[in-house]
A protein has these predicted regions:
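Active-site-proximal alpha-helical scaffold in enzymes
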Residues: 76-89, 137-148, 153-189, 227-249, ...
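Short, well-ordered amphipathic alpha-helical segments that serve as non-catalytic structural scaffolds
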Residues: 76-85, 140, 167, 239-241, ...
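ACP-dependent fatty acid/polyketide chain-elongation machinery
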Residues: 1-65, 242-254, 347-361, 405-407
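A glycine- and small-aliphatic-rich helix-loop capping segment at beta-alpha/alpha-beta transitions
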Residues: 20-27, 110-124, 174-177, 197-210, ...
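Conserved beta-ketoacyl condensing-enzyme motif
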Residues: 6, 27-159, 188-199, 293-306
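Condensing-enzyme catalytic core mediating Claisen C-C bond formation in acyl metabolism
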Residues: 3-7, 30-34, 211-295
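Glycine-/small-residue-rich "gating" segment that lines the acyl/pantetheine channel
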Residues: 121-128, 169, 173, 190-246, ...
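Acyl-CoA/ACP chain-elongation machinery
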Residues: 179-225, 258-272, 300-307, 324-374
């Protein structure tokens, strides 16, 4: 079986514009959640989010291309460029067997909203010719493949909050089955706009702690009352092991297992007791050969049911509370980046392995009796991490799990 390794990482989110500054901020427990500035949120019931501040897309794109690309694409290009440089990909690396696996939950939602208003108020002839190409989710992969001349498979995952994780597993499958030797994975999201915030708020999915932005996202805490929307992108360069070794690439880790499942339960609520999440974890563990897992980066959204059911699923997958490794959610820092979350958190997980340190679950102040695992509360923890798991679960009952191992 062809082995899949990770050789490059990149990310941008509310606490950092690159992987190193982001990871340091996450370890330091910095929270990127503040009052919304991307639009006037005064009429919204939820007025806080984790925005990427001071982002200049012209640092990674030609100014003429910027107007053709929605913000989620711009963020994705930034993370992808960092990952490619980090992997040491130069002109000598062959491009025909180098593909892209992109992900987003909602794509160009702000663009859709903006052009719908233009259509209603000024007529359809005033719609931007760049509207459709900038709004489609798969255009993230399209822009990136053009930018880096990647001529292998060009895939896209649109599975809500599990999309970034599924983009990794889809890329891995492509390499394992021989469809490519290298895949650039990018998950990106930028849905902080009136209809995005208003839509999630209407579902009662978001925290309404407008007066305490930095305390609003509190995974596994008894006082949690919903997630906070974030934006950003994560990127990983995946390579077939022998191809990576042949060019002398630095390897962050090997993807030794992945698992996917469907809840078939409810459009937004997870399956009772996290049954679907459990099956995804079990599938990943089985594929990986049931290794000892040293750390889990949880989906941990700060919603009542996700955190409760994910805890139950972890305990079932590992055969009881006493066998569970430490678990943390980094969504207290970055908020929930929706379709980008899985890619961002895969990057965080691999950096935790690299540096031998577990990121903390911040804002963990009041233990919930239903959430009774070790959540690495509030302070990072040094530890030898040989094997780590990353979980993502999305609306529609779609679940994805990744397991990485040091090489």
């Amino acid at each position: 079986v062809r082995r899949v390794v990770v050789t490059g990482l990149g990310m941008i989110n509310a606490v950092g514009h690159d992987k190193e500054s982001s990871f340091k901020a996450i370890l330091d427990g910095q929270c990127g959640i503040e009052r919304i500035t991307l639009f006037d949120a005064s009429r919204q019931s939820v007025q806080i989010a984790a925005e990427v501040k001071d982002f200049d897309p012209t640092t990674v794109m030609d100014a003429r291309e910027v107007k053709k690309a929605d913000r989620f694409i711009q963020l994705g290009i930034k993370a992808a460029s960092e990952a490619m440089v980090d992997a040491g990909i130069d002109e000598s690396v062959e491009r025909e067997r180098f593909g892209v696996s992109s992900a987003s939950g909602i794509g160009g939602l702000a663009n859709i909203e903006r052009n719908a208003i233009i259509c209603e108020n000024r007529g359809p002839r005033r719609i931007s010719p760049f509207f459709i190409p900038s709004a489609l989710v798969n255009m993230l992969g399209g822009f990136i493949s053009i930018e880096h001349r990647l001529k292998g498979p060009n895939l896209s995952s649109v599975t809500a909050c599990a999309a970034g994780t599924h983009a990794v597993s889809e890329a891995a499958k492509t390499i394992i089955l021989g469809g490519a030797d290298r895949m650039l994975v990018v998950g990106a999201e930028a849905a902080i706009c009136p209809v995005g915030i208003g839509g999630f708020a209407a579902m009662k999915a978001l925290s309404t702690r407008n007066d305490e932005p930095a305390k609003a996202s509190r995974p596994f805490d008894a006082g949690r009352d919903g997630f906070i929307m974030g934006e950003g992108a994560g990127a990983l360069v995946l390579e077939e092991y022998e191809a990576a070794v042949a060019r002398g690439a630095r390897i962050y880790g090997e993807l030794i297992g992945f698992g996917e499942s469907g809840d078939a339960n409810h459009i937004t609520t997870p399956a009772p007791e996290g049954e679907g999440a459990y099956r995804a974890m079990k599938a990943a563990l089985t594929m990986a050969g049931n290794p000892k897992v040293d750390y889990i980066n949880a989906h941990g959204t700060s919603t009542k049911y996700n955190d409760w059911y994910e805890t139950m699923a972890i305990k079932k997958a590992f055969g009881g509370k006493e066998n569970c490794p430490p678990v943390s959610s980094t969504k207290g820092q970055t908020a929930h980046c929706l379709g980008a979350a899985g890619a961002i958190e895969a990057v965080i997980t691999l950096m935790a392995m690299r540096d031998g340190i577990m990121p903390p679950t911040i804002n963990y102040e009041n233990p919930d009796p239903d959430c009774d695992l070790d959540y690495v509360p509030n302070t990072p923890r040094e530890a030898k991490i040989e094997v780590a798991m990353s979980n993502s679960f999305g609306f529609g009952g779609t679940n994805g799990v990744l397991i990485f191992k040091k090489v």
